Amino acid sequence: MSVALFCGPPPAVSFGCKDGRGRKGMVRSKDIVRQTVKPPAHACRLIGWNKYPGSVVPTNSSLSPSPTALDDEIELDPSPFLIIYKDGRIERLKGTTVIPACPEVATKDVIIDPATGVSVRLYLPNVVDLPSKKLPVLVYFHGGGFVIENTGSPNYHNYLTLLAAKSGLLIVSVNYRLAPEHPIPASFDDCMAGFNWVVSHSAGPAPEPWLARHGDLTQILISGDSAGGTVTHYVLLRADAGVIEGAALVHPYFLGSKRLENQTEEDFEFHEKLWRLSTPDTEGLDDPLINPLAPGAPSLAGLKCKRAVVFVAELDFLVERGRMYYDALVKSGWGGEAELVHQKGVGHVFHLSDYSGDVSVDMMAKMVAFLRGE
């Protein structure tokens, strides 16, 4: 079975870049798609994020605003991720392109919960030569700040295809619901459901034949990047003991109410607002869901895995939070083996867009070695 990274060009889609006052003068790009969906009614009222009230409406009070003008009024502007209009539409600016599952490289999509629409994408490496071999299973959670990306995003599809080919693991990538339409903890709940769905194949009838035939359910690992790294920590606290062999947290999206020295005020404020948009009922950046080191957060000694590795990038806004997490884990009394991989000269999730650079190749080698237990 050959493993191809690209199954064909992404679909031709378009996206409009805002000029600060609606969609006037927008440019088109084939790489991004406009999604118009309705968020919860309260989501747009919570934070004053670059509001432009009425700026596209005629100033002459005798004129009635046109429907087009009203449609284009911006309520919140957390670009470059998304724009929320006053009529409730959400326009995602990135992370929406979907590459279809590729039968040529043994990938497929499976809906695991028809009620919520939560699905998984499975990546089965070359088993034609070893049809009876059972493979370790990696459950993966994608990033995107909880508001963008999906299992079919080109970066994730191509990266996980490559990872499956190099590691020889059967990978299950969870396609969870996004905020603000589905406020947190929906994404956390969906990922936990995806993990439990995989584990369920170890007892009783197995609904997914790939996992039943090729998955070694005694060797389950989990991983995620950015927001997916945050979810990885969440799952580690809630899984049954003895189920997870190892966990890899890649540039985990951990925040906190205190701005660190390496974090600019602009970046800090952006991520605070993004978290509040995603989590309307949050108490702030010391919510244990986003800050595992906050007062009252569950002890890291309770992580349910034997091995853990934390990847951090020198130029990443989140680098110090990742290092702090690793240090706290080592000091927590947790009984597993912990490793920190600090890579220099690169930024947040650099490895998803550059597969051939020296640092990316080194990171892939370290990830594969960890997953294999080498």
UniProtKB/Swiss-Prot annotation:
Gene3D superfamilies reported for this sequence: alpha/beta hydrolase
EC numbers, comma separated: 4.2.99.22
Quaternary structure, from the entry: Homodimer.
UniProt cross-references to InterPro entries, sorted A to Z: AB_hydrolase_3 (IPR013094), AB_hydrolase_fold (IPR029058), Carboxylest/Gibb_receptor (IPR050466)
UniProtKB keywords: Amyloplast, Lyase, Plant defense, Plastid, Transit peptide
Catalytic residues as annotated in Swiss-Prot or TrEMBL: S226 (acyl-ester intermediate), D316 (charge relay system), H348 (charge relay system)
Superkingdom to which the source organism belongs: Eukaryota
GO annotation, cellular component aspect: amyloplast
Transit peptide in keyword set: yes
Single GO molecular function: lyase activity
Function (record text): Lactone-forming carboxylesterases, specifically catalyzing intramolecular transesterification, but not hydrolysis. Involved in the biosynthesis of tulipalins, defensive chemicals that show antimicrobial activities against a broad range of strains of bacteria and fungi. Substrates are 6-tuliposide A > 6-tuliposide B.
Subcellular location: Plastid, Amyloplast
Catalytic activity entry: 6-tuliposide A = tulipalin A + D-glucose
Pfam families noted in UniProt: Abhydrolase_3
Similarity comment: Belongs to the AB hydrolase superfamily.
Gene name in the database record: TCEA-B6
Protein name: Probable tuliposide A-converting enzyme b6, amyloplastic
Transit sequence range: 1-68
GO terms (BP aspect): defense response
Misc. comment: 6-tuliposide A and tuliposide A-converting enzyme, which are compartmentalized in the vacuoles and plastids respectively, come into contact with each other for the enzyme reaction releasing toxic tulipalin A upon cell disruption by pathogen infection or herbivore predation.
